């Protein structure tokens, strides 16, 4: 009887640990010196979070440590633009189901930084549109990785006139040589950068997607199998 009770206690303890919510996760000093590894069906990517966006950094670390992202799909994929994930409703979602409205039940205040822009490989927070979200607050969990495309000076000149913005010279050079999505700058919070796995980004971005009600969802599911913190490689 004592053995049975002890085993039951172990099972309950393990189950409670697995069910830990992001709000219950405690960050340690060493967590801030770790990178985030995303193991997907299409390969592994490694993200380095920005210390310039502490609200988004801490939230992302807590979600990763809690296992929140394990099993979620890349539910919105647009070639030469971005790949989006982080919707908890995508876990186990049947084929054809429209996705993109799931969240942990909270948003994060925008953290726009001039030095963080939408070059290829950046990690940025998804959000609802300006009509219902004029403060541009970020989704609590959904994020995207920019693939983008290369822009000419002429294309950026046109964008500047239409948006009444100025793209700094150093960022222009990046958009011309590396690529990205400059029209998103200072509209969506950038909070990290892909440091390994750019070929995985390109592979996912090139996958065939739906044109039905679940528009832009990959026809064959691509998921984050496991998200975890890993030691930084120098």
What are these regions (language model features)?
Residues 4-13:
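Sec-dependent N-terminal signal peptides
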Residues 17-234:
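Cyclophilin-like peptidyl-prolyl cis-trans isomerases
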């Amino acid at each position: 009887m004592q053995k049975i009770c002890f085993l039951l206690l172990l099972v309950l303890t393990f189950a409670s640990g697995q069910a830990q919510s992001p709000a219950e996760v405690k960050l340690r000093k060493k967590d801030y010196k770790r990178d985030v590894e995303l193991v997907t069906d299409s390969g592994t990517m490694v993200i380095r979070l920005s210390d310039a966006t502490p609200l988004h950094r801490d939230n992302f670390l807590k979600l990763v440590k809690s296992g929140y992202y394990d099993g979620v799909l890349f539910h919105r994929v647009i070639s030469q633009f971005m790949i989006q994930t982080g919707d908890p409703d995508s876990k186990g979602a049947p084929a054809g189901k429209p996705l993109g409205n799931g969240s942990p039940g909270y948003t994060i205040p925008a953290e726009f930084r001039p030095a963080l822009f939408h070059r290829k490989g950046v990690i940025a927070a998804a959000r609802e549109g300006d009509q219902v979200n004029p403060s541009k607050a970020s989704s609590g969990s959904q994020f995207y990785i920019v693939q983008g495309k290369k822009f000419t000076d002429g294309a950026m000149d046109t964008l500047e006139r239409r948006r009444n913005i100025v793209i700094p010279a150093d960022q222009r050079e990046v958009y011309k040589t590396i690529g990205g999505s400059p029209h998103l700058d200072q509209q969506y919070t950038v909070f990290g950068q892909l440091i390994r796995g750019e070929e995985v980004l390109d592979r996912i971005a090139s996958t065939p997607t739906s044109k039905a009600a679940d528009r832009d969802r990959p026809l064959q599911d691509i998921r984050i199998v496991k998200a975890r913190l890993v030691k930084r490689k120098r």
